[in-house]
Amino acid sequence: MGRRLDHAKLSDFDEVQKACAKVVTTAQLSSVIDAAIREFGFRWFALVHDGHLQKQQPEQLMMTNYPASWVDEVISDRLYMHDPVHIASARSAFGLCWERIADVIAPTRRQLSVLTRGRDHGLVSGFTIPFRIPGERGAFFTVARKRDRPFSNVEMMTARLIAGVAFQRGRELVGGIELTVPSVSLMRPVRGWA
């Protein structure tokens, strides 16, 4: 994988994709993602489905290397129900930096307290990418770090590439891919292209 984010090449992302394709469990996928995000300069990640995290099902994505104390707090106090990161990023097609949450929603006191509690566990700055596929549960992929500085365009693009690969493989592993997808023609055939 890459030496550092600023020296990353597309072949580095290809290596991540190949490693993800080889895994057969979500635990293995989580390990590959953890190694990849660290190689690219991030500290933490989470790949989770929308919904009640207390009622974990085998077909639910819930992979993270967040501090265990934070994960326990999020689940036991049901903070995921009021997470402004998920609420705001769901309104973005391409991901959202946490410092821009107030540009997208007017966070309530309760939502702001979720951010404060996350900071208390070291999750200071982050970038979250939403996934919405018709007929499937929504999901989010997040990278986070301790440093309080905005994510660069290169960092956001890196997170998007890793997120796409991780989410796709995660869906395959938990059975989230719809087997009967209707065919939809988005373009009319153009003469001479066939």
Region annotations inferred by a language model:
Residues 11-24:
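Short regulatory/linker helices and ligand/cofactor-binding micro-motifs at input modules
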Residues 23-59:
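Helix-loop-beta substructure at the N-terminus of cytosolic sensory domains
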Residues 65-109, 115-119:
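Regulatory sensory and allosteric helical modules in signal-transduction proteins
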Residues 125-131:
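Short hydrophobic beta-strand micro-motif common in sensory/regulatory domains
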Residues 132-145:
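Sensory-domain boundary capping and coupling elements
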Residues 144-157:
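Regulatory loop-to-helix N-cap segments in sensory/regulatory domains
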Residues 161-176:
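Signal-transmission/dimerization alpha-helices at domain junctions
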Residues 177-194:
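Helix-turn-helix DNA-binding segment
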